[in-house]
Design a protein with these regions (language model features):
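Bacterial N-terminal signal peptides
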Residues: 6-16
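Positively charged n-region of N-terminal signal peptides that target proteins for export
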Residues: 1-5
Length: 228
């Protein structure tokens, strides 16, 4: 029977092979790997402006993180087969491991601040498109499992000029140690509420990112006004 302890064991196994910080992602293309290794040799004199076009690419860590979330999410979806797991617990696992939550939020936040935002599959494709600013999105999540009770959400956007020189960054980060959800005797609503905290934590980190992004753009606005 696929109960909570079975789910814990499966999630723990999934964590071993897909932890974002160390996973080897076979699906990463050579072009995707290429973007993960470029590094600015100096800070850029360019500034951010609302009228700019942004070309976005995912870091290697983000590609790995998305695989981790997809694996975790798939386990959560399968956990409801034959009604073996309380629906409230299952739904909490599904909601808190949504692979699209952070990426959609981050891209949406960029779209609110800049004229256009396009996500590219490779650095080559991005550079050929010649956007005004290059953005590398870096994401990291760590969710609860039988072996882990520390939940982490770290999101960062690094901005570069057309020569890949560093302009600045926006970021948000929340880390929290959670009480174990695997203790026998806990009621389903209590377990579901604990698991839901994973999503709340991610949202809090994303809100931090939004505030950081606004501050970065506002700083550029003020610098431009002072220069005129």
């Amino acid at each position: 029977m696929f109960n909570l302890l079975t789910l814990a064991a499966v999630l723990s196994t999934s964590m071993v092979f897909t932890t974002p910080a160390s996973a080897a992602v076979s699906s990463v293309s050579a072009a995707s790997e290429q973007v993960c290794h470029f590094a600015p040799v100096a800070d850029s004199a360019a500034s951010l402006q609302h009228t700019q076009s942004l070309g976005v690419i995912y870091s290697e860590n983000t590609v790995s993180n998305l695989q981790y979330l997809n694996n975790y999410h798939s386990v959560a979806l399968r956990s409801g087969q034959n009604g073996a797991l309380d629906s409230r617990i299952r739904n909490a696992f599904i909601s808190s491991s949504d692979p699209k939550l952070a990426i959609d939020w981050l891209v949406g936040s960029l779209k609110k601040e800049f004229a256009s935002v396009t996500v590219y599959d490779s650095l080559d494709a991005l550079m050929q498109a010649r956007p005004d600013v290059v953005v590398m999105l870096d994401t990291y999540n760590r969710l609860v499992s039988k072996r882990n009770s520390q939940v982490e959400a770290r999101f960062m956007a690094r901005f570069y000029d057309t020569n890949l020189q560093y302009i600045g960054k926006a970021e948000g980060e929340v880390v929290r140690e959670m009480t174990s959800v695997w203790v026998q005797g806990k009621a389903a609503p209590e377990i579901a509420a604990q698991i839901d905290q994973q999503r709340d934590l991610q949202v809090n980190a994303l809100k931090q990112f939004d505030a950081s992004l606004k501050a970065l753009v506002m700083q550029a606005d003020r610098a431009q006004v002072a220069a005129n």
